[in-house]
Swiss-Prot record:
GO molecular function, one term: rRNA binding
Gene: rpl23
The protein, known as: Large ribosomal subunit protein uL23
One Gene Ontology term, aspect cellular component: ribosome
Similarity-based family: Belongs to the universal ribosomal protein uL23 family.
InterPro entries assigned: Nucleotide-bd_a/b_plait_sf, Ribosomal_uL23, Ribosomal_uL23-like, Ribosomal_uL23/eL15/eS24_sf, Ribosomal_uL23_CS
Length: 83
């Protein structure tokens, strides 16, 4: 199985999005929203509310992953050692 999530972004905007319970990640170009959702739910044992994707001018695919209110995006990043 191919890992769809390449890395999580820690920028000024992505840190502001954490307050809205949204994770920001660079994902594989072939990844579809439903596959990203399933992978996040499986890896971190959380429920995802929705996934929005866009392709950056650099040619990377970025995903905004909104978690359900019962889960904390900040906790996930702290488990990964980002914070």
């Amino acid at each position: 199985m191919v890992m769809l999530i390449k890395c999580f972004l820690v920028t000024e905007k992505s840190v502001a999005e954490l307050e809205k319970n949204v994770l920001t990640a660079i994902v594989d170009m072939r990844a579809r929203k439903e596959h990203i959702k399933k992978e996040i739910e499986k890896l971190f044992n959380v429920e995802v509310e929705r996934v929005n994707t866009l392709i950056t001018p650099k040619g990377e695919k970025k995903a905004y992953i909104k978690l359900k209110p019962d889960y904390s995006a900040e906790e996930i990043l702290s488990k990964l050692g980002v914070f």
